Amino acid sequence: MLKLFSAFRKNKIWDFNGGIHPPEMKTQSNGTPLRQVPLAQRFVIPLKQHIGAEGELCVSVGDKVLRGQPLTRGRGKMLPVHAPTSGTVTAIAPHSTSHPSALAELSVIIDADGEDCWIPRDGWADYRSRSREELIERIHQFGVAGLGGAGFPTGVKLQGGGDKIETLIINAAECEPYITADDRLMQDCAAQVVEGIRILAHILQPREILIGIEDNKPQAISMLRAVLADSHDISLRVIPTKYPSGGAKQLTYILTGKQVPHGGRSSDIGVLMQNVGTAYAVKRAVIDGEPITERVVTLTGEAIARPGNVWARLGTPVRHLLNDAGFCPSADQMVIMGGPLMGFTLPWLDVPVVKITNCLLAPSANELGEPQEEQSCIRCSACADACPADLLPQQLYWFSKGQQHDKATTHNIADCIECGACAWVCPSNIPLVQYFRQEKAEIAAIRQEEKRAAEAKARFEARQARLEREKAARLERHKSAAVQPAAKDKDAIAAALARVKEKQAQATQPIVIKAGERPDNSAIIAAREARKAQARAKQAELQQTNDAATVADPRKTAVEAAIARAKARKLEQQQANAEPEEQIDPRKAAVEAAIARAKARKLEQQQANAEPEEQIDPRKAAVEAAIARAKARKLEQQQANAEPEEQIDPRKAAVEAAIARAKARKLEQQQQANAEPEEQVDPRKAAVEAAIARAKARKLEQQQQANAEPEEQVDPRKAAVAAAIARVQAKKAAQQKVVNED
């Protein structure tokens, strides 16, 4: 009973939700054997024919290449490409490739020489003696990628599987209409396909190996059964024809009943899937030592006279293949690369064949029907019923059209396999797959930008952290340098510390005084007296310095004289502006005048008694003259403001004027007599004295005129004569001094 259950379990087939049954249209091309196509004159080999980054160029323009020679180096996930034939590299430039966008990609352009010479080939017939790593590296360096349509590097896929793969599935379903490349390959090369499957099994060491094939390929099924007749490690599973049973997730569920988790991979559940064409390419790479330079391509459609499957070299222009098959284009002819549901229309026919090219469909105008105009969605939910991934295409359509990327991601748009079943059943002829492709591309671009922004932020934060560390290190170095004293400073610091400790020790010692004795403070008193004497000496020195500076500086003397004159003028103004009721006492004024005369006589006597060698300071004389003028003006104002009844005697004034003139003459004579011959008279002093004499003369004249009583009039003639005499004497004194100076 247990064996019966195991046998039932072994051959059980599961069914997935959704799916459609379109016309197969496979009989147009699967009835004729594989054939070779003549070499083209020029080959265009894009550097990127797989998922991932392009390899590094290892050829240059003008190089001679052989078939199978690497054109790029494959490092990491970068898959190399190889020359499809022998010839010369004529250009390395961007060229439009087999892509829905028809964007230009960097390509190597080779002109064939027609000889089609191979590089030396080193096959590993005894591959079982090789290690797993060696086999994976050989598969990778020979450019083997998934030929079912995805183009994922096979070596990377095998490396990622590791030791956790329990089931190896070979996808031979080929469910899309018109395409028969795998069907024809299994019919003509079944033994080589099985040998490639065994190499994959040797690398992965799975518990079971399953080949899934649809029941609409009877010849291929019979050929595989014939090859597997004596094999018990490989199981051939025939499944019902249903589109898209060839999808990776759908075929995995059909054969194992396991579902690939959302956002995960089939390896997460212990399953790894490879295409029939990939298994054949692995056999040629490992056993025959031939890199992938060609693949099987289906040429079909009513616009082709000789449909079938051909061995097409990679890089062959599509136009060359179609012309070899008898292509008869119509006015609005279109050519589809791939099937009618998952393929795309080529913008022009000079694009090259690449590793993922499995079919070239050239339908007639009536074969696919007239293109229908897109209409509004009627919410019929037919797309949701047909979706094999259990998605909601209607909602995804609205989210994609409205640029609602977050909601589209939430509704698992990434799980869409772009099979086209929803668009096939849509009564409004909405190209849903195109909307979904565009939305996924935009989401991928947004995530790529976010990734770059995150990387830039991480780099910025790392840089900021590095700068902060460097700043902290600099501050620490500066701090250490500031704390550590120089060698010569250490001794001074040590000496200062020693003195402080000594003082502290002395301070802590108790003062002991014996009974009956007085403390000896003589040292303290002597120190205090010394400090006082030093302070007094400094003060005396400072005073001497200031006096010397005062005597030596003529500018300071001139400033002091100017200050004295300013004060005198201010005093005159105050007295002139005094109130009328505040009268100056004439007696007090007379006393002040007598004091001034006494000071003048005293000054004359001092000058007369001065030693001959003593020189009169001209600055001091100028200051004294200014003071005398100020006092004279003050006295004159006081006399003018005196009461009318107290009038000054004009005779007395005349006597005083005469006395003043006599004193002036006497002073001039003394100065001339006491001056040494070599000593020159200061012209400034002479001018000051002359001015004093003139001022006194004018003062006396004014006093006499203002204060004389009406009945006692002074003879004006006499006053004029006296003034003239005074002026003549002043001029004479000035001239005499000038002569003495000369």
Curated annotation (Swiss-Prot):
Membrane topology: Peripheral membrane protein
Region (Disordered) residue spans: 602-719
Enzyme Commission number(s): 7.-.-.-
InterPro entries, alphabetized: 4Fe4S_Fe-S-bd (IPR017896), 4Fe4S_Fe_S_CS (IPR017900), Ion_transpt_RnfC/RsxC (IPR010208), Nuo51_FMN-bd (IPR011538), Nuo51_FMN-bd_sf (IPR037225), RnfC_N (IPR026902), Soluble_ligand-bd (IPR019554)
Annotated binding of [4Fe-4S] cluster 1, by residue: C377, C380, C383, C426
Reported cofactor(s): [4Fe-4S] cluster
GO cellular component, one term: plasma membrane
This protein's record includes keyword Transport: yes
Record-stated family: Belongs to the 4Fe4S bacterial-type ferredoxin family. RnfC subfamily.
Family annotation (PANTHER family): ION-TRANSLOCATING OXIDOREDUCTASE COMPLEX SUBUNIT C
Protein name, UniProt field: Ion-translocating oxidoreductase complex subunit C
Protein species of origin: Escherichia coli O6:H1 (strain CFT073 / ATCC 700928 / UPEC)
